[in-house]
Regions:
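N-terminal, polar/charged subdomain of small-to-medium soluble alpha/beta proteins
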Residues: 1-111
Length: 111
């Protein structure tokens, strides 16, 4: 089983419940795991998952609209990655570092 990890993908987003979060934006950190079966073990690029495309899908979801809740944002990323790559398992963690005090994160997954 091959698992692709995209870690610490930092993107500016306008997500949150409060008006200032939507107006000013803030950093969100994405960690993605995709179990892609045996894709890529034959060393053929055509059979592998393009890592850049994984990050592009995450960025597209992040930029497409504003979400009030991290739960909805994380699930939207899971849905988009599932549709694009059809992995055997997927896990997306979205972290919102600018929460006082500390950091908040939400994980959405689908086997």
């Amino acid at each position: 089983m091959i698992t692709i990890h995209v870690e610490d993908l930092r993107l500016l987003g306008r997500h949150g419940v409060h008006a200032h979060e939507k107006e000013n934006g803030q950093e969100f950190v994405y960690d993605v795991e995709l179990d892609v079966g045996e894709r890529g073990i034959d060393d053929r690029i055509a059979d592998a998952v393009d890592y850049r495309e994984v990050t592009r899908v995450v960025q597209d979801v992040n930029d497409a609209r504003s979400y009030d809740l991290l739960e909805a944002l994380a699930t939207a990323v899971v849905d988009a990655l599932q549709e694009r790559f059809a992995p055997e398992r997927i896990r997306v963690r979205v972290t919102k570092p600018a929460v006082e005090p500390g950091t908040v994160s939400v994980t959405s997954s689908r086997p």
